[in-house]
Amino acid sequence: EIVDKYSESITSMIGGDHSVTACAVRGVKKAYPSERIGILQLDTHLDVRDPAELGPANGTPIRQLIDGGFVRGEDIVNIGLHGYFNAKPLIDYAKQHSIQMVTLKNARKAGVVESVKAALSQLSEKVDRIYVTVDMDVLDISVAPGVPASTPGGLSASELFDSLLEIGKHPSVRHIDFVCLDPSKDSQVAETTKTGVYAWLQFITGLRLR
């Protein structure tokens, strides 16, 4: 009934750790069982760890969705990979399931916003709706210390803001989440929290420009 009443609505979730994404996408699939879902993931990590090891957790949602048959690996684009956190077995799994991996280095060569626009265009050609998941650890530690896995060398705030404006403008984007923002680890000036709020507002601004 809710789906029928709000069929044109955009769902937005501000979550805890990244495990919530698996639950959210399963819910989308339940609501739209005949539709093909694509995922644009802005993240430092692949999040394809095996849940059989320690159970469903922060690093397992993408694998849960692929192994559960909710999303095809070929319908997932990850932009923002950097650092030394994606071990070979995880990369091998991603390659085996045809996940498109765009490192932050390569995204910057092409232009981060252009890389995001290309991913949205590519996904929209083959899926019915796009789910965007924004892991705040994709940001550089200097602007986002309040995340579980803060790292140097990540996205700048302006790169994320500009990307989210384009994401909000794209008609195939129907769902978005912002995850891994931990205020208890934030700085005294709450820069991660403020950056997260501005990121969400940029997405909303993009929606208004559709």
Regions found by a protein language model. Give the residues of each.
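Conserved alpha-helical scaffold segments that buttress catalytic/binding sites
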Residues: E1-R210
